[in-house]
């Protein structure tokens, strides 16, 4: 939540923390799950870091972090992992880092509020949040197969499919 009691989706918190880590550790790897893709990749690229995607889940995130010596890993579900904390999840470290980031923001400019740090991200990369459906009369694999068959035909056949963690369709 920000100072206005507005709930912040995990993707924006991961973006804020990725920027904080890359400010201190330029060019380091940041690991994130596929639900965080657009905002997180943008923040990491702008800060000069190495964007590294992983399947969702702590065991996958930690493994990819170790393989890439990543300084930080974040999930949409608000789980945050830290190299300097033996790749463990912590709920306390993120809010301490956000407080540190906010306190440093006033050193060379007017102090920023958390809402100001995320407003630009929200405007650039709005998200719906997770949407779940109950399927009646059809199986999830059948739906995924139909989507996999159909989506590449859109946008002049420029869509690409990613099956890292479920099915993602990327449009250029």
What are these regions (language model features)?
Residues 1-12, 40-41:
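Short Gly/Thr/Asp-enriched flexible loops that form oxyanion-binding sites at enzyme active sites
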Residues 14-16:
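Extended, compositionally biased non-globular segments that define protein topology
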Residues 19-23:
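A short, N-terminal amphipathic alpha-helix
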Residues 25-172:
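Phosphate-binding and adjacent anionic-ligand microenvironments
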